[in-house]
């Protein structure tokens, strides 16, 4: 489903601000894989997601999504393969439009249609049905402006919008980091439910080691732009956060000094 073949990226090469962000990242996801990604600030987690999304072009290597080489495709041409949810609940939705209109935009993405044609009764019924699966009562608030929703409600809606067209790959970039612990837990549970029910392939960046082990069937740990650990489902089931810390220190040769990674 996803083949990241030895990609590398250096920002501002030759300048005093030169930064090697990715160094020979090689990662392969089978269809249905749900991979959690963890590492300290600057480890390369979000940069890897951005590379897949086409936010920038890689210096070396290739990226293949569902058999299609997208390495040299611009971001907007890759969008049809991807669903994406960012850390900020304000991203991914239009605050001044209502819930129904936001879903219509997501549903018609790539179809060359706009809201000028109106929302059909069939589409409205489908949106209501999808919203009901969130368990937040949003199906009864479809005319409400999205800007009036809470952060958790908005992030749940963004997640639904990102998956409503069954993307080949779902990218989740710390999508619960801005939420309070209870709301974050609810959104993570919902995330796992949507991924499982729709048989999606997904990558989720997190700083929370407990969440990294609890969700998904693989956990990738990055350090200084490299993948240093790739933990399979069976290993995930039997290790704890403390074990993961030891594994990191052995693989990287250094201690974790980012407090955010010790949460949970």
Residue ranges: model-predicted function:
Residues 206-207:
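H-loop/switch region of ABC-family ATPase nucleotide-binding domains
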Residues 61-68, 231:
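Conserved ABC transporter NBD signature motif
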Residues 1, 10-24, 74:
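A short, flexible loop at the N-terminus of ABC-type nucleotide-binding domains that lies
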Residues 162-163:
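ABC ATPase C-loop
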Residues 226-252:
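Conserved beta-strand-loop-alpha-helix hinge in the C-terminal portion
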Residues 38-40:
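The feature captures the beta-strand-to-loop junction immediately N-terminal to the Walker
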Residues 15, 57, 69-83, 91, ...:
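ABC ATPase NBD coupling module
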Residues 53:
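Helix-to-loop junction immediately C-terminal to a conserved catalytic motif
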